[in-house]
Amino acid sequence: MKAMVSNASGGYCLNSAMPQPSPMPGMMLVRVEAVALNPYDTKVIEYGIITPEPYVGGCDFAGVVVAAGPGVTRFQPGDPVLSMHTRGGFAEYALAFEDMSCHIPKGMSYNEACSLGLGIGISGLALFQQPGLNLPLQHGQDLSDMTGNGRSNGYTNGHTNGHTNGHSKGEEEQKDPVIVLVAGGASASGTMATQLLKLAGYNPIVTCSPANNSLCESFGASACFDYNSTTCGADIRLHTDNSLAYVVDCVTNVATMTMCYEAIGTQGGTYIALDATANTVKYTRRDVRADWVMANTLLGEPCKLDGVYGRSSAPEHREFASHFFRLAERWLAEGKIRNHPLEIRTGGLESVDAGLQDLRDGVIRGKKLVVPLHVGA
Protein backbone atom coordinates (compact mmCIF):
# COMPACT_ATOMS: atom_id res chain seq x y z
CA MET A 1 0.00 0.00 0.00
CA LYS A 2 1.00 3.65 -0.29
CA ALA A 3 2.01 5.53 2.84
CA MET A 4 3.95 8.61 3.88
CA VAL A 5 6.97 7.59 5.94
CA SER A 6 9.54 9.68 7.76
CA ASN A 7 12.91 10.32 6.14
CA ALA A 8 16.36 11.40 7.28
CA SER A 9 15.77 15.02 6.26
CA GLY A 10 13.02 15.48 8.83
CA GLY A 11 10.03 15.17 6.53
CA TYR A 12 7.79 12.53 5.00
CA CYS A 13 8.13 10.81 1.64
CA LEU A 14 5.87 8.46 -0.29
CA ASN A 15 6.54 4.74 0.01
CA SER A 16 4.42 2.70 -2.40
CA ALA A 17 5.41 -0.69 -1.03
CA MET A 18 4.46 -0.57 2.64
CA PRO A 19 2.80 -3.73 3.95
CA GLN A 20 -0.88 -3.48 4.78
CA PRO A 21 -1.33 -3.83 8.55
CA SER A 22 -3.50 -6.48 10.16
CA PRO A 23 -5.80 -5.69 13.08
CA MET A 24 -4.84 -7.06 16.47
CA PRO A 25 -7.43 -7.69 19.22
CA GLY A 26 -9.48 -4.58 19.90
CA MET A 27 -8.42 -2.95 16.64
CA MET A 28 -9.88 -2.36 13.18
CA LEU A 29 -8.40 -2.02 9.73
CA VAL A 30 -9.69 1.19 8.15
CA ARG A 31 -9.56 2.25 4.51
CA VAL A 32 -8.54 5.86 4.96
CA GLU A 33 -10.67 8.44 3.15
CA ALA A 34 -9.19 11.64 4.62
CA VAL A 35 -6.45 12.70 7.05
CA ALA A 36 -5.90 15.85 9.08
CA LEU A 37 -2.48 17.38 9.67
CA ASN A 38 -1.29 18.37 13.15
CA PRO A 39 1.84 19.94 14.66
CA TYR A 40 2.35 16.60 16.42
CA ASP A 41 3.14 15.02 13.05
CA THR A 42 6.16 17.29 12.68
CA LYS A 43 7.35 17.04 16.27
CA VAL A 44 7.63 13.25 16.25
CA ILE A 45 10.36 13.62 13.62
CA GLU A 46 12.00 16.86 14.74
CA TYR A 47 12.47 15.65 18.30
CA GLY A 48 13.45 12.13 17.28
CA ILE A 49 10.49 10.74 19.14
CA ILE A 50 9.83 7.78 16.88
CA THR A 51 12.34 5.04 16.05
CA PRO A 52 13.18 2.88 14.21
CA GLU A 53 12.48 3.78 10.59
CA PRO A 54 10.23 3.66 8.72
CA TYR A 55 7.61 5.54 10.67
CA VAL A 56 4.21 6.16 9.08
CA GLY A 57 2.88 9.46 10.40
CA GLY A 58 -0.69 10.61 10.87
CA CYS A 59 -2.75 10.65 14.06
CA ASP A 60 -6.09 12.05 12.80
CA PHE A 61 -8.01 10.09 10.16
CA ALA A 62 -11.42 8.95 8.99
CA GLY A 63 -12.53 6.18 6.68
CA VAL A 64 -14.42 2.92 6.36
CA VAL A 65 -13.92 -0.19 8.48
CA VAL A 66 -12.58 -2.99 6.28
CA ALA A 67 -11.94 -5.64 8.92
CA ALA A 68 -12.47 -5.95 12.66
CA GLY A 69 -9.99 -7.73 14.91
CA PRO A 70 -10.90 -10.17 17.68
CA GLY A 71 -13.04 -8.67 20.41
CA VAL A 72 -14.36 -5.71 18.41
CA THR A 73 -18.11 -5.37 18.96
CA ARG A 74 -19.07 -1.73 18.30
CA PHE A 75 -17.96 -1.63 14.66
CA GLN A 76 -18.31 -3.87 11.66
CA PRO A 77 -17.02 -3.77 8.08
CA GLY A 78 -18.63 -0.94 6.14
CA ASP A 79 -19.03 1.41 9.11
CA PRO A 80 -17.78 4.99 8.62
CA VAL A 81 -15.37 5.79 11.45
CA LEU A 82 -13.17 8.59 12.79
CA SER A 83 -10.24 7.79 15.00
CA MET A 84 -7.02 8.99 16.56
CA HIS A 85 -3.73 7.13 16.89
CA THR A 86 -0.16 8.25 17.43
CA ARG A 87 0.86 6.95 14.01
CA GLY A 88 -0.32 5.26 10.82
CA GLY A 89 -2.94 7.63 9.41
CA PHE A 90 -0.89 8.85 6.42
CA ALA A 91 -1.63 5.68 4.47
CA GLU A 92 -4.22 4.01 2.30
CA TYR A 93 -5.04 1.68 5.22
CA ALA A 94 -4.61 2.35 8.93
CA LEU A 95 -5.24 0.59 12.21
CA ALA A 96 -7.74 2.10 14.64
CA PHE A 97 -8.45 1.21 18.25
CA GLU A 98 -12.12 0.41 18.80
CA ASP A 99 -12.17 2.31 22.10
CA MET A 100 -10.57 5.43 20.61
CA SER A 101 -12.91 5.71 17.64
CA CYS A 102 -16.35 7.17 16.95
CA HIS A 103 -19.03 6.35 14.41
CA ILE A 104 -19.31 9.21 11.94
CA PRO A 105 -22.79 10.73 12.20
CA LYS A 106 -24.99 10.99 9.13
CA GLY A 107 -24.42 14.16 7.19
CA MET A 108 -20.78 14.56 8.26
CA SER A 109 -18.17 14.20 5.52
CA TYR A 110 -14.91 12.29 5.89
CA ASN A 111 -13.06 15.59 5.53
CA GLU A 112 -14.91 16.98 8.53
CA ALA A 113 -14.69 13.78 10.56
CA CYS A 114 -10.95 13.27 10.15
CA SER A 115 -10.26 16.58 11.90
CA LEU A 116 -11.90 15.60 15.20
CA GLY A 117 -10.29 12.52 16.75
CA LEU A 118 -7.05 13.95 18.14
CA GLY A 119 -8.83 17.09 19.35
CA ILE A 120 -11.37 15.04 21.27
CA GLY A 121 -8.66 12.93 22.86
CA ILE A 122 -6.08 15.56 23.79
CA SER A 123 -8.62 18.21 24.85
CA GLY A 124 -10.48 15.69 26.98
CA LEU A 125 -7.22 14.66 28.62
CA ALA A 126 -6.16 18.25 29.25
CA LEU A 127 -9.50 19.20 30.79
CA PHE A 128 -10.80 16.18 32.65
CA GLN A 129 -7.80 14.08 33.76
CA GLN A 130 -4.54 14.30 35.68
CA PRO A 131 -2.02 15.74 35.01
CA GLY A 132 -4.48 18.05 33.24
CA LEU A 133 -6.98 20.34 34.93
CA ASN A 134 -8.84 17.27 36.23
CA LEU A 135 -12.14 19.12 36.15
CA PRO A 136 -15.23 17.15 37.13
CA LEU A 137 -17.76 16.62 34.36
CA GLN A 138 -20.99 18.36 35.33
CA HIS A 139 -24.67 18.13 34.37
CA GLY A 140 -24.60 14.35 34.91
CA GLN A 141 -21.89 13.75 32.29
CA ASP A 142 -20.03 11.22 34.45
CA LEU A 143 -18.48 9.04 31.73
CA SER A 144 -20.93 6.29 32.60
CA ASP A 145 -21.46 3.41 30.21
CA MET A 146 -22.38 4.87 26.82
CA THR A 147 -23.94 1.67 25.48
CA GLY A 148 -27.38 3.07 26.15
CA ASN A 149 -28.31 0.71 28.98
CA GLY A 150 -28.37 3.57 31.47
CA ARG A 151 -26.14 1.77 33.99
CA SER A 152 -23.08 3.53 35.31
CA ASN A 153 -19.84 1.58 35.23
CA GLY A 154 -18.59 3.69 38.11
CA TYR A 155 -16.06 5.64 36.07
CA THR A 156 -16.22 9.33 36.98
CA ASN A 157 -12.68 10.61 36.26
CA GLY A 158 -11.88 10.51 39.95
CA HIS A 159 -14.70 12.77 41.10
CA THR A 160 -18.02 12.08 42.77
CA ASN A 161 -20.81 12.52 40.25
CA GLY A 162 -22.81 15.66 40.92
CA HIS A 163 -19.99 17.41 42.74
CA THR A 164 -17.88 20.23 41.37
CA ASN A 165 -14.86 21.83 43.01
CA GLY A 166 -16.00 20.66 46.42
CA HIS A 167 -19.57 21.97 46.15
CA SER A 168 -22.68 19.84 46.42
CA LYS A 169 -25.12 19.64 43.56
CA GLY A 170 -27.50 21.99 45.31
CA GLU A 171 -24.78 24.54 45.89
CA GLU A 172 -23.55 24.19 42.32
CA GLU A 173 -26.97 25.06 40.90
CA GLN A 174 -26.91 28.35 42.80
CA LYS A 175 -23.51 29.39 41.46
CA ASP A 176 -22.40 30.65 38.09
CA PRO A 177 -20.47 28.12 35.99
CA VAL A 178 -16.76 27.97 36.78
CA ILE A 179 -14.70 30.02 34.32
CA VAL A 180 -11.90 28.29 32.39
CA LEU A 181 -9.48 30.22 30.17
CA VAL A 182 -8.57 28.71 26.80
CA ALA A 183 -5.46 30.43 25.44
CA GLY A 184 -5.39 30.12 21.66
CA GLY A 185 -9.14 29.91 21.36
CA ALA A 186 -9.14 30.22 17.57
CA SER A 187 -6.90 27.18 17.07
CA ALA A 188 -8.41 23.78 16.31
CA SER A 189 -7.48 22.60 19.81
CA GLY A 190 -8.96 25.78 21.22
CA THR A 191 -12.36 25.46 19.58
CA MET A 192 -12.56 21.80 20.64
CA ALA A 193 -11.64 22.63 24.23
CA THR A 194 -14.21 25.43 24.24
CA GLN A 195 -16.96 23.09 23.04
CA LEU A 196 -16.09 20.38 25.56
CA LEU A 197 -16.00 22.86 28.42
CA LYS A 198 -19.41 24.23 27.47
CA LEU A 199 -20.87 20.73 27.20
CA ALA A 200 -19.40 19.79 30.58
CA GLY A 201 -21.02 22.75 32.31
CA TYR A 202 -18.20 25.31 32.43
CA ASN A 203 -17.90 28.89 31.21
CA PRO A 204 -15.07 29.09 28.65
CA ILE A 205 -13.34 32.38 27.93
CA VAL A 206 -10.60 32.62 25.31
CA THR A 207 -7.69 34.60 23.95
CA CYS A 208 -7.58 35.18 20.21
CA SER A 209 -7.13 37.85 17.58
CA PRO A 210 -10.08 40.28 17.50
CA ALA A 211 -10.73 39.11 13.94
CA ASN A 212 -11.58 35.67 15.36
CA ASN A 213 -13.94 36.80 18.13
CA SER A 214 -17.04 35.75 16.21
CA LEU A 215 -15.53 32.35 15.43
CA CYS A 216 -14.69 31.67 19.06
CA GLU A 217 -18.07 32.89 20.27
CA SER A 218 -19.78 30.55 17.80
CA PHE A 219 -18.06 27.61 19.51
CA GLY A 220 -19.23 28.74 22.96
CA ALA A 221 -16.76 31.31 24.29
CA SER A 222 -18.49 33.82 26.57
CA ALA A 223 -15.70 36.40 26.29
CA CYS A 224 -12.70 36.98 24.02
CA PHE A 225 -9.46 38.78 24.85
CA ASP A 226 -6.86 40.10 22.42
CA TYR A 227 -3.69 38.10 22.96
CA ASN A 228 -1.68 40.88 21.28
CA SER A 229 -2.67 43.39 23.94
CA THR A 230 -0.04 44.14 26.57
CA THR A 231 -2.84 44.18 29.14
CA CYS A 232 -4.39 40.86 28.10
CA GLY A 233 -3.57 39.04 31.35
CA ALA A 234 -4.67 41.99 33.47
CA ASP A 235 -7.89 42.34 31.47
CA ILE A 236 -8.73 38.69 32.10
CA ARG A 237 -7.98 39.01 35.81
CA LEU A 238 -10.31 42.02 35.98
CA HIS A 239 -13.04 40.20 34.03
CA THR A 240 -12.85 37.21 36.38
CA ASP A 241 -12.74 39.31 39.56
CA ASN A 242 -9.28 37.96 40.36
CA SER A 243 -10.70 34.45 40.70
CA LEU A 244 -9.46 32.59 37.60
CA ALA A 245 -8.07 29.22 38.67
CA TYR A 246 -8.07 27.06 35.51
CA VAL A 247 -6.18 27.61 32.26
CA VAL A 248 -5.51 25.39 29.24
CA ASP A 249 -2.91 26.80 26.84
CA CYS A 250 -3.34 25.58 23.26
CA VAL A 251 -0.43 27.73 22.02
CA THR A 252 2.22 26.98 24.62
CA ASN A 253 5.07 29.41 24.24
CA VAL A 254 6.76 31.76 26.69
CA ALA A 255 4.52 34.69 25.77
CA THR A 256 1.22 32.84 26.22
CA MET A 257 2.39 31.12 29.40
CA THR A 258 3.42 34.48 30.86
CA MET A 259 0.05 35.99 29.94
CA CYS A 260 -1.81 33.04 31.49
CA TYR A 261 0.16 33.37 34.71
CA GLU A 262 -0.80 37.05 34.84
CA ALA A 263 -4.47 36.14 34.36
CA ILE A 264 -4.65 33.56 37.16
CA GLY A 265 -6.02 35.05 40.37
CA THR A 266 -4.00 35.70 43.49
CA GLN A 267 -5.35 32.52 45.09
CA GLY A 268 -3.42 30.53 42.50
CA GLY A 269 -4.60 27.82 40.15
CA THR A 270 -3.67 25.27 37.51
CA TYR A 271 -2.07 25.89 34.13
CA ILE A 272 -2.08 23.06 31.57
CA ALA A 273 -0.32 23.18 28.20
CA LEU A 274 -0.31 20.97 25.11
CA ASP A 275 3.48 20.91 24.91
CA ALA A 276 6.42 21.07 27.30
CA THR A 277 6.27 24.15 29.50
CA ALA A 278 8.99 26.78 29.87
CA ASN A 279 10.81 26.57 33.20
CA THR A 280 11.64 30.27 32.93
CA VAL A 281 7.95 30.96 33.57
CA LYS A 282 6.85 27.82 35.39
CA TYR A 283 8.47 28.68 38.70
CA THR A 284 7.67 32.38 38.78
CA ARG A 285 4.53 31.56 40.78
CA ARG A 286 4.59 28.87 43.42
CA ASP A 287 0.81 29.08 43.78
CA VAL A 288 0.28 27.82 40.21
CA ARG A 289 0.53 24.14 39.32
CA ALA A 290 1.89 23.92 35.78
CA ASP A 291 1.97 20.74 33.71
CA TRP A 292 1.32 19.53 30.19
CA VAL A 293 -0.27 16.60 28.40
CA MET A 294 0.67 14.59 25.33
CA ALA A 295 -1.43 12.38 23.10
CA ASN A 296 0.80 9.34 23.48
CA THR A 297 -0.33 8.68 27.04
CA LEU A 298 -3.91 8.13 25.87
CA LEU A 299 -2.75 4.72 24.62
CA GLY A 300 -1.93 3.73 28.19
CA GLU A 301 1.60 2.73 27.20
CA PRO A 302 4.95 4.17 28.32
CA CYS A 303 6.52 6.85 26.13
CA LYS A 304 10.13 5.72 25.86
CA LEU A 305 11.53 9.08 24.88
CA ASP A 306 14.46 11.23 25.91
CA GLY A 307 14.17 14.27 28.13
CA VAL A 308 10.84 15.84 28.99
CA TYR A 309 8.98 13.71 26.45
CA GLY A 310 9.58 10.49 28.33
CA ARG A 311 6.60 9.33 30.36
CA SER A 312 5.69 6.19 32.24
CA SER A 313 2.58 4.23 31.31
CA ALA A 314 -0.74 5.76 32.32
CA PRO A 315 -3.40 3.03 32.13
CA GLU A 316 -5.88 5.44 33.69
CA HIS A 317 -5.55 7.64 30.59
CA ARG A 318 -6.49 4.72 28.34
CA GLU A 319 -9.45 3.93 30.57
CA PHE A 320 -10.50 7.57 30.41
CA ALA A 321 -10.15 7.64 26.61
CA SER A 322 -12.24 4.52 26.15
CA HIS A 323 -15.13 6.13 28.02
CA PHE A 324 -14.67 9.67 26.77
CA PHE A 325 -14.77 8.65 23.11
CA ARG A 326 -18.13 6.99 23.81
CA LEU A 327 -19.42 10.21 25.30
CA ALA A 328 -18.00 12.21 22.40
CA GLU A 329 -19.68 9.87 19.93
CA ARG A 330 -23.01 10.63 21.56
CA TRP A 331 -22.35 14.37 21.44
CA LEU A 332 -21.40 14.06 17.76
CA ALA A 333 -24.61 12.18 16.99
CA GLU A 334 -26.58 14.91 18.76
CA GLY A 335 -24.83 17.62 16.74
CA LYS A 336 -23.20 19.13 19.83
CA ILE A 337 -19.61 18.88 18.56
CA ARG A 338 -18.54 20.32 15.23
CA ASN A 339 -15.27 20.64 13.41
CA HIS A 340 -12.94 23.62 13.19
CA PRO A 341 -12.92 25.51 9.84
CA LEU A 342 -10.99 23.44 7.31
CA GLU A 343 -8.50 24.09 4.55
CA ILE A 344 -8.67 21.25 2.04
CA ARG A 345 -5.47 20.29 0.23
CA THR A 346 -5.62 18.39 -3.04
CA GLY A 347 -3.00 15.93 -4.24
CA GLY A 348 -3.61 13.02 -1.89
CA LEU A 349 -0.87 11.57 0.29
CA GLU A 350 1.89 13.25 -1.67
CA SER A 351 0.65 16.67 -0.54
CA VAL A 352 1.06 15.81 3.15
CA ASP A 353 4.70 16.86 3.49
CA ALA A 354 4.12 20.31 1.95
CA GLY A 355 1.15 20.83 4.25
CA LEU A 356 3.20 19.96 7.31
CA GLN A 357 5.87 22.41 6.21
CA ASP A 358 3.21 25.11 6.09
CA LEU A 359 2.33 24.25 9.69
CA ARG A 360 5.99 24.60 10.68
CA ASP A 361 6.24 27.94 8.91
CA GLY A 362 3.11 29.33 10.55
CA VAL A 363 1.38 29.82 7.21
CA ILE A 364 -1.88 28.24 8.39
CA ARG A 365 -4.00 30.53 10.56
CA GLY A 366 -7.45 29.72 11.88
CA LYS A 367 -7.88 26.57 9.77
CA LYS A 368 -7.20 22.87 10.13
CA LEU A 369 -5.43 21.28 7.19
CA VAL A 370 -7.16 18.25 5.71
CA VAL A 371 -6.04 15.99 2.87
CA PRO A 372 -8.69 13.81 1.20
CA LEU A 373 -7.29 10.60 -0.25
CA HIS A 374 -10.21 10.09 -2.59
CA VAL A 375 -12.38 12.46 -4.61
CA GLY A 376 -15.64 13.26 -2.82
CA ALA A 377 -14.42 12.53 0.71
Swiss-Prot record:
Keywords of this entry: NADP, Nucleotide-binding, Oxidoreductase
Region (Disordered): 143-173
Polar residues biased stretches: 144-155
Species lineage: Eukaryota, Fungi, Dikarya, Ascomycota, Pezizomycotina
Residues binding NADP(+): A186, S187, A188, S189, S209, P210, A211, N212, Y227, L274, D275
The protein's role, per its UniProt record: Trans-enoyl reductase; part of the gene cluster that mediates the biosynthesis of fusamarins, isocoumarin derivatives that show moderate cytotoxicity with IC(50) values between 1 and 50 uM. The polyketide synthase FMN1 probably synthesizes two different polyketides, a tetra- and a pentaketide, containinga varying number of double bonds depending on the selective actions of the trans-enoyl reductase FMN2. Chain fusion will presumably be mediated by the KS domain before finally offloading is catalyzed by the alpha/beta hydrolase fold enzyme FMN3.
Domain of life the protein comes from: Eukaryota
Gene name per UniProt: FMN2
Induction: Expression is induced when NaNO(3) is used as sole nitrogen source. Expression is positively regulated by the cluster-specific transcription factor FMN4.
Family membership noted in the UniProt record: Belongs to the zinc-containing alcohol dehydrogenase family.
PANTHER family given in the database record: HYPOTHETICAL OXIDOREDUCTASE (EUROFUNG), TRANS-ENOYL REDUCTASE APDC
Protein name as it appears in the record: Trans-enoyl reductase FMN2
Pathway(s) it belongs to: Secondary metabolite biosynthesis
Protein's organism: Fusarium mangiferae (Mango malformation disease fungus)
InterPro entries per UniProt: ADH-like_C, ADH-like_N, GroES-like_sf, NAD(P)-bd_dom_sf, PKS_ER, Trans-enoyl_RdTase-like
Ranges where the Enoyl reductase (ER) domain occurs: 7-370
Mutant lacking the gene: phenotype: Impairs the production of fusamarins.
Enzyme Commission numbers on file: 1.-.-.-
Gene Ontology molecular function: any one: nucleotide binding
Gene3D superfamilies: Medium-chain alcohol dehydrogenases, catalytic domain (3.90.180.10), NAD(P)-binding Rossmann-like Domain (3.40.50.720)
